[in-house]
Regions:
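Sec-dependent N-terminal signal peptides
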Residues: 4-16
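Soluble extramembrane regions of membrane proteins in the secretory/endomembrane system
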Residues: 18-100
């Protein structure tokens, strides 16, 4: 899995001098405050014409209703999304990771 992420990152960095890539943290417990943050992050990345968004995930999970809202926002994104599982993505974190 790490090879695939590394390959994707190398690919993104080699085809342009000034590419914009957003890194969005998803750490700790997933609660209802996180979906609006993720939605704003995606909107900002799209407005900045970012090449991609990398979600840095390290969570034991949390509320599945919040994770479902995040999943829907990621699937609706108009730019590529990448899940970087930085240690763990359990339960709701796995759902979010799989939506990228």
């Amino acid at each position: 899995m790490k090879k695939h992420i590394l390959t994707a990152l190398i690919f993104l960095f080699t085809f342009g001098v000034s590419q914009v890539i957003y890194k969005v943290p998803i750490h700790d417990t997933i609660d209802l405050g996180l979906p609006p943050f993720i939605e704003r992050s995606i909107e900002m990345a799209e407005a900045d014409s970012a090449e991609a968004i990398i979600f840095d995930i390290d969570t034991f999970g949390g509320r599945l209703d919040a994770a479902t809202q995040i999943k829907d926002a990621i699937l609706s994104a108009n730019i590529p999304t990448i899940a970087f599982i930085n240690r763990r993505a359990i339960s709701a974190g796995a759902l979010i990771s799989l939506s990228c």
